[in-house]
Amino acid sequence: MKTVKVTTDNKISIIDVDFDDFRSIQCAIGGHFETVHTQLMADYFKDPSVIMLVDEEGLIKELPLNPVGSALYRSVIAGDLIFAQVRGDDIVAPDDAEDLKDRLLHTFIGLQEA
């Protein structure tokens, strides 16, 4: 399933992630993950189901700051992240990964395609 990944060095890309396999998510992020959602994200994406999956131990591991994630969370996000959506009890790929990527590229100065 296609999703958007944003790295700490401001690179954005479309990647394949099997959201039915937590190991696939861990591989994409680089460790154990947690979900992050804010009202700012819901407003920005015009969709309350959009979430970020971030490295749960990013700060403990002293990973670099993720500027995009930190801006959307309004607090420090350390490490790479991917976007997803919540559907009931499931975490699934975004409806339109390309549109999500384009929206982020137009908003965040310095963000570049990988």
What are these regions (language model features)?
Residues 1-114:
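Domain-length accessory/inserted modules outside core catalytic folds
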